[in-house]
Amino acid sequence: MVKPPRTPVLPRIAATALGLLAAASLQAQEVTLKVHHFLAPTSNIHENLIQPWCAKVQKESAGKLKCQLYPAMQLGGTPPQLFDQARDGTVDIVWTVPTYQAGRFPKTEVFEMPFLTEHAERASPALYEYVQKNALDEYRGVKPLFLHVNDGNILHMGKVAVRRLEDLKGLKVRAPTRLGTRILSALGATPIQMPVPAVPEAIAKGVVDGAMLPWEVATSLKMQEIAKAHVETPAGHPKISTITFALVMNQAKYDGLPAELKKVIDANSGVEASRWAGKVADAALAPARKIAQDRGNTFVTLSAEETRRWVEATAQVDDDWVREVSAKGINGKALLDDARALIRKQP
């Protein structure tokens, strides 16, 4: 019986070593991105924006890019610290509100001006274009993947159904950001700043009379149960205000990715990704509003005349902002005009 020839020992060892090296190289190509944000895992943004974005990136990279998600500040810190966590490399990606750091993003916050935006799907790509054109210096150390706004802030009131400007006088209302504080002050309310998760309990206990929030976040906060009245601008008119959001990645982490994985990140970033993010925010409005309707909550739609009064009352916010940033060498009027023009040009 003829025995099969035996493979020499050294070639077998070499082949095994090469196989292990190839496997190690493949493993090295796999990157897990730590993604941190401040909303609950049941929130619209987590379920319908961040998770799908991560799934798409994983699929298009053939599994080489994966996200490890940390909602609700699970990695510690506070929401205003998220941007620096990404910049410093504590995490790889964050979804955050840049303007939670008052005064640090003066160019970005122009999109939070009163009565500037109506639909997030239109305003969000405009915001991305605006930042790329005018405000990248505010994002040193990170790569903005996409930016967006919410579906528009309205007033969710605990017991008082605000119908006229005078009704707001002296009421304590939660403000989301620095400009939100100024807007509420201009309307006659007493602005109170607090984190989003604290709002429902604050209204329930009477710490505040209401909150300036979008419908998009209302359901995860159960605002429809806590607030009894909702104050909105008429259809076709810009909302009282909005908030700017950004998904940003540590620049060094991005720069260290293989070219093929950078392409995947790039394909899921930019103007169209921002438009999609805005669409996700807008899509949450109708279902959230319906929950409040089904509960029999009161809805107040400001009349055209009353809306005009609110717009006039908050015009000083625009003027004050322009003067403030101009004193820092920033052409505030040009930035505000550009923001309006970029929103108008969107389909």
Regions found by a protein language model. Name each.
Residues 125-132, 137:
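Signature of the catalytic double-stranded beta-helix
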Residues 2, 29-122, 137-347:
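N-terminal secretory/targeting leader peptides
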Residues 12-25:
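Bacterial N-terminal signal peptides
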Residues 1-10:
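N-terminal secretory signal peptides that target proteins for export/translocation
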